[in-house]
């Protein structure tokens, strides 16, 4: 089960990576003003742009950087219930893991069709017992349209602001914060940093974008490290009452999966830094705020993890379902 979960997460990261790099029919999709429906992702872009329009008109005071900050917090908060459902599903998976391992051990080495069907049936009964459904596995997918839509909105916003009379671009009266213009773009692709600086010299804008890129990398790495620490602690708690010599060891496949996951996560952090360097500065601000808020969100969720886990245990015991 853990391998399946890791595979799902890996697929999510791969899909997200290809989407963020703008893999679409038209490479110009991310450099168009937000006007008219011309691609599938516009379904998600316009609601996000609408949020930014409202924020820019009200608490953003026509300030584009402030609007990015407030809008990011609002969108992440909207997705918070989905995060909570995902976290609860992870807790249930912790409860089910010992019984799941018993089923796997029971049918270990049995490749006949009858054994496979029985194992599948017992697994489904176990999931039903703990209230685990397919919907819980789909929760991360539900978040993705929100975040991808907002990413594409931020990417296209500079072109909307530059377009005269654009419905959302005209809302913003200023696009700078701390001397950094959030709509300017490096337009240097993935060229080496030294060559860019040598050619154009150090400017406040380039220093600011570089700082944002570094902050994106740092905040993303902190989020990854803290997540790994939480996962390790949860795994240790799960087998804390089992003597060390009886604790299950990771298989070679599980170790390879874990290494692949770590590589994907760190590679994602690196790519985010590169995207910020070659994109408008607003993207960097969006990711920094999003990373910090997500880390806080995860920490806040961790605070109540043990209480929710204990509550789930008691609930199952009261129903007489835990032997």
Where would I find each of the regions flagged by the language model?
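Helix-loop-helix
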Residues: 2-15, 19-323
């Amino acid at each position: 089960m853990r391998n399946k979960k890791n595979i799902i997460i890996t697929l999510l990261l791969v899909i997200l990576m290809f989407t963020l790099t703008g893999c679409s029919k038209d490479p110009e999709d991310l450099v168009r003003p937000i006007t008219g429906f011309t691609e599938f992702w516009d379904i998600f872009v316009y609601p996000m742009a609408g949020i930014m329009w409202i924020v820019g008109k009200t608490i953003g005071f026509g300030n584009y950087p402030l609007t990015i900050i407030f809008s990011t917090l609002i969108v992440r908060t909207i997705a918070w219930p989905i995060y909570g459902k995902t976290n609860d599903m992870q807790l249930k998976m912790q409860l089910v893991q010992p019984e799941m391992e018993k089923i796997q051990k029971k049918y270990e080495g049995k490749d006949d069709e009858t054994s496979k069907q029985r194992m599948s049936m017992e697994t489904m009964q176990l999931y039903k017992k703990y209230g685990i459904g397919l919907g819980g596995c789909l929760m991360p997918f539900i978040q993705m349209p929100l975040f991808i839509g907002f990413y594409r909105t931020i990417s296209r916003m500079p072109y909307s602001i530059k377009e005269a009379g654009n419905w959302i671009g005209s809302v913003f009266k200023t696009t700078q914060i701390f001397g950094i213009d959030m709509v300017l773009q490096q337009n240097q692709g993935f060229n080496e940093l030294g060559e860019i600086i040598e050619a154009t010299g150090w400017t406040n804008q380039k220093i600011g974008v570089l700082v944002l890129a570094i902050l994106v990398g740092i905040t993303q790495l902190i989020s990854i490290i803290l997540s790994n620490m939480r996962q390790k602690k949860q795994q240790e708690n799960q087998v804390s009452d089992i003597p060390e010599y009886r604790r299950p060891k990771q298989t070679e496949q599980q170790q390879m999966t874990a290494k692949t996951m770590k590589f994907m996560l760190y590679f994602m952090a690196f790519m985010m830094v590169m995207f910020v360097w070659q994109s408008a500065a607003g993207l960097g601000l969006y990711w920094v705020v999003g990373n910090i808020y997500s880390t806080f969100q995860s920490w806040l969720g961790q605070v109540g993890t043990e209480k929710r886990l204990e509550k789930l245990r008691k609930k199952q015991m009261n129903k007489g379902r835990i032997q």
